[in-house]
Amino acid sequence: MKIDNVEIITCPAGWRAWDFLRVSTDTGIVGFSDITDSNGAAPAVIAAVKMFGESILGRDPRQYEQVYSDLYRSSRQSAGGVVHKALAGIDNCLLDITAQSFDVPVYALLNGPSRDTVDLYWSHCATTRVRHAAEVGQTRPTALTDFESIGKEVSDTGYRAAK
C-alpha cells in the first residue's frame, strides 16, 4: 500500500472556512483529518501540509510512526504550532488508513480505548449567536434573559454543558 494523493479540502462555512486533509492510497483506502486553524494561521498550516504531503507520496501509510518521525526531523528547526498542526493532520490520516486496512478502530492502534463514553458539549453556542447571528439564522442575544433562554435550549437539546 502506498500513498498516492494528498489533498486539502476547504469548505466555506459562512464567516470562516473549515479545512480538511484527505490522504488517498493506491488501494482505494482514504484517510481524513480536520486541519482547521481558527487563529489566523490557516494559510501557513495549509502550506506546511502541502510541503509535507509531497514528501510522503509513495510511502506506506501503515508505517505512520516512521513517517511522522521523518517529517518531524525534517522540520526540527521550525518546530512550533503550525508545523505540529500540519503533522497532526497527516498523522491522523495515516492512523485512519492503517485502522481501515486492518479493519479495526483507530483506538485499537493506540493501545485500546481510554474510556467507554465521551461527554459532548455545545461549542461556540452563544459566541456564534453574538458574532454571527445573521449567518446562523438567529437573533443576536443582548440581555441576560436571552442567554438564559440559550442555556435552556442547550439543556433541552440534551447537552449537559456549553462553551
Question: Regions from the language model: what does each represent?
Answer:
Residues 26-102:
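Metal- or metallocofactor-binding catalytic centers and their adjacent structured scaffolds
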Residues 14, 88-89, 144:
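Short alpha-helix boundary/capping motifs
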